[in-house]
Amino acid sequence: MKTVVFAYHDMGCLGIEALLAAGYEISAIFTHTDNPGEKAFYGSVARLAAERGIPVYAPDNVNHPLWVERIAQLSPDVIFSFYYRHLIYDEILQLAPAGAFNLHGSLLPKYRGRAPLNWVLVNGETETGVTLHRMVKRADAGAIVAQLRIAIAPDDIAITLHHKLCHAARQLLEQTLPAIKHGNILEIAQRENEATCFGRRTPDDSFLEWHKPASVLHNMVRAVADPWPGAFSYVGNQKFTVWSSRVHPHASKAQPGSVISVAPLLIACGDGALEIVTGQAGDGITMQGSQLAQTLGLVQGSRLNSQPACTARRRTRVLILGVNGFIGNHLTERLLREDHYEVYGLDIGSDAISRFLNHPHFHFVEGDISIHSEWIEYHVKKCDVVLPLVAIATPIEYTRNPLRVFELDFEENLRIIRYCVKYRKRIIFPSTSEVYGMCSDKYFDEDHSNLIVGPVNKPRWIYSVSKQLLDRVIWAYGEKEGLQFTLFRPFNWMGPRLDNLNAARIGSSRAITQLILNLVEGSPIKLIDGGKQKRCFTDIRDGIEALYRIIENAGNRCDGEIINIGNPENEASIEELGEMLLASFEKHPLRHHFPPFAGFRVVESSSYYGKGYQDVEHRKPSIRNAHRCLDWEPKIDMQETIDETLDFFLRTVDLTDKPS
């Protein structure tokens, strides 16, 4: 049986050996080049392949059409993946008639994603295992073919658990590979309601937060002990690594992070105390705890900190252009809720952010981005993170003012992007679900879906292509000049302060605000082309939480990523949105102040939006990148969002002239 193998690490080596022992013919092996910044304690797949006389490759992008074609020419019967670090696209998986199978180091559906070995230790699990599962488009989600459980002992650390997993993997493959070869396997679908997903870990994720319980910190030490980079802390600005530890149920009133004693080296935690058994100061040598205390100059009562003292006091500076807009003002509120952000904002108005103007960590200037270029360049240079949220994003303007849309949405934003490149600043750029255009995929996927728009004589697409071209420019700057970026694509976010009723009066608003205006004024709700177009509506609170996590960027997992932020469960047509809104309106305590409902009216899109408009029938996001990078999923039901949005706008209406 011919196979193509994707493999890396010790698991890759043992997987290859198991395939050969089971009589598989390996046509080619795809692996990775070693990362010079990573301690290579594991076997080399490339070396093993060379010794076995098997062609081996390490392309940067195995999913490139050229590599897909080369793999197709190998005509594999089956494909195997053993700890290959990149997602293998469906175009490759479909090449093998018998399917594709992946070896994963956890008891799926638990601990999907990256670094399950480390995560189970971080989380204090007592059991894990290995799973062989069928590969599908979604990572680690295919049916389970075989699974083997192993116990995690209290004294297990990352390397001992790694050895246990390797031993279990050998057993599992020896038992299962012959069955796959003969087409005699039983597959069990994963239970999605039990699934958990974790992202990649970096060395910076392993800092010791002393306010946490000692048991939690001890688990962190176990999870990243040598040969992993190690858990760490600071004495002032001096970094040190903790290689091994013990939990002490020490009842102390000392502040977390305080040194209780130096021999043994005991540190007060949020609950109990942690004994540092062995550690290392800076890039020095490993030593036992009391010697480490002496080297670091620690005495009883000394304080440790989770980050260097010189950086602990500095807040992250976030520049929000368009801070008074729907996303900008809600994001400002979320950032100021924390104590480690300083927000700088620019906009042409301040009505939505007036509640922040006296906040000590909020700095606002009223101005236009097309005029205040010097202020913007200075603040891009000054700040750490830049969010250029200024854009014309209302559909009627795409046909009414296409050149103004291009000038503001593309030209002005391109200038800001170039400032970020010039000063090497991180940019979080608001792409849009509009870039997918008339894509026919069931779920719009950031990495696979085609971006399809209409002909040039349909100016409705100028917003979509302006945003798409900026996405491509940012991506190119990231590839060629090292720009640190994340692109996020909101899918129909809605909530309080989405546009305003005055904007709706001239047609320059999003759907729900326009519908609320119709109810307030007693005018018919207009259903464009029947209102059958479906959208996935996302509560602003869910959207902002995802955006906040992008800004936090735990483990740098968001760098270079495109992330859809939407709620695929909240799919409804515009007609259904109108009906839900009407039902909420009729039950509202202020209902008697407003005119009778004037009904629904079907109108043609050309009469409403003007010549050159095209609509999209459906727009449903894949949110796998949001799961993977942010550990995020939307939680708020569409009805709750409708109720709160309606209530907000009704309470902004001057009721003095309304009937009672």
Curated annotation (Swiss-Prot):
At which positions is UDP-alpha-D-glucuronate bound? 393, 398, 432-433, 460, 492, 526-535, 613
Kindly provide the name given to this protein in its UniProt entry. Bifunctional polymyxin resistance protein ArnA
GO cellular component terms, semicolon-separated: membrane; protein-containing complex
Outcome of substituting residue 104 to K: Less than 1% residual formyltransferase activity
Q: What turns on expression? A: Induced by BasR.
**What does the entry list as the binding residues for NAD(+)?**
347, 368-369
Enumerate the residues marked as the site Transition state stabilizer.
102
Q: Pathway membership of this protein?
A: Nucleotide-sugar biosynthesis; UDP-4-deoxy-4-formamido-beta-L-arabinose biosynthesis; UDP-4-deoxy-4-formamido-beta-L-arabinose from UDP-alpha-D-glucuronate: step 1/3; Nucleotide-sugar biosynthesis; UDP-4-deoxy-4-formamido-beta-L-arabinose biosynthesis; UDP-4-deoxy-4-formamido-beta-L-arabinose from UDP-alpha-D-glucuronate: step 3/3; Bacterial outer membrane biogenesis; lipopolysaccharide biosynthesis
What is the organism of origin for this protein?
Escherichia coli (strain K12)
Enumerate the GO terms in the molecular function aspect: identical protein binding; NAD+ binding; UDP-4-amino-4-deoxy-L-arabinose formyltransferase activity; UDP-glucuronate decarboxylase activity; UDP-glucuronate dehydrogenase activity
Q: Where is this region: Formyltransferase ArnAFT?
A: 1-304
Swiss-Prot/TrEMBL keywords: Antibiotic resistance, Lipid A biosynthesis, Lipid biosynthesis, Lipid metabolism, Lipopolysaccharide biosynthesis, Multifunctional enzyme, NAD, Oxidoreductase, Transferase
Locate the region Dehydrogenase ArnADH. 314-660
CDD domains attached to this UniProt entry: Arna_FMT_C, Arna_like_SDR_e, FMT_core_ArnA_N
Spell out the PANTHER family in the cross-references: BIFUNCTIONAL POLYMYXIN RESISTANCE PROTEIN ARNA (PTHR43245), UDP-D-APIOSE_UDP-D-XYLOSE SYNTHASE 2 (PTHR43245:SF13)
Q: Look up the EC number in the record and give it.
A: 2.1.2.13, 1.1.1.305
Instruction: Tell me if DNA-binding is a UniProt keyword of this record.
Output: no
Q: How does it assemble?
A: Homohexamer, formed by a dimer of trimers.
Xref: HAMAP family: ArnA
Picking any one GO biological process from the record gives: response to antibiotic
Indicate whether NADP appears among the record's keywords.
Answer: no
Task: Report residues binding (6R)-10-formyltetrahydrofolate.
Answer: 86-88, 114, 136-140
Q: Which InterPro entries does the entry link to?
A: Arna-like_SDR_e, Bifun_polymyxin_resist_ArnA, Epimerase_deHydtase, Formyl_trans_C, Formyl_transf_N, Formyl_transf_N_sf, Formyl_transferase-like_C_sf, Lipid_A_modif_metabolic_enz
* Its biological purpose: Bifunctional enzyme that catalyzes the oxidative decarboxylation of UDP-glucuronic acid (UDP-GlcUA) to UDP-4-keto-arabinose (UDP-Ara4O) and the addition of a formyl group to UDP-4-amino-4-deoxy-L-arabinose (UDP-L-Ara4N) to form UDP-L-4-formamido-arabinose (UDP-L-Ara4FN). The modified arabinose is attached to lipid A and is required for resistance to polymyxin and cationic antimicrobial peptides.
The entry's active site is 104 (proton donor), 434 (proton acceptor), 619 (proton donor)
* Site feature: Raises pKa of active site His: 140
